[in-house]
């Protein structure tokens, strides 16, 4: 008996969906940003035991990049008020990783206007670092380009992470990406700093980014915040839209509402190179005690409010630190600022 054409089509569509669910892109790169974004929560005071365990866990879990922290200026920031991962000296990284004879690559972030990159970032041949992530706003792109070219000339992989992208105008974004496309930068990063984006708005932005990235042969990355409980959903959306570099953190640790959690993301990617068990073990042995010690991050109403209004979470962070619970008053305050 011949199967009706409509049934054949439905069966083919079902099989395509099953294949999509079971398939994975080999170009995906998973970036652990726990120390860097999580360091904003505890001023980068992680013990060496914690950092070594995180490094070993990333290796076992198949994570592609581990971001150690910032390359912040010691002239601008008091070294006595921050842990070592605010500054990421090469010797401190080597004390953790040795020669790093593994597949795990190492990254640091350098903020425009907050680092002495010409002196503090050594040539790649002298450093354990593989990737320099240049953080900028859309209005500081010329300074970012100078940093990008400096890092490329020193032999590094380089990304450009344009922060607070949800507040930028499309014409400004296009101009910035066209300027960046003509540099040696390897990756354009979409950064939802305020956790204000939804999957559909992110999809439109990725399409826009990808048009220019493809023109210049660049890769795309995503860094999501969890103010509206959408960091994981937005990262998954980005994967489906062709983004390759995915930032995530253990237990979602990060400034304010935190970031995309690495645990469900590993499961979502369907790639046999990734192993979620070491991540679960690290969470049990290190992240849960860190929470119990009083270090706070994660979704709460105050972060939802700033995300809804596309505002920087600094007011919500202050609300949390002050131990306030008057959410309705806080809502009135942030609406008045909008």
Explain the meaning of each model-derived region.
Residues 7-338:
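Catalytic cores and adjacent flexible loops of soluble metabolic enzymes
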Residues 1-3:
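Methionine residue identity
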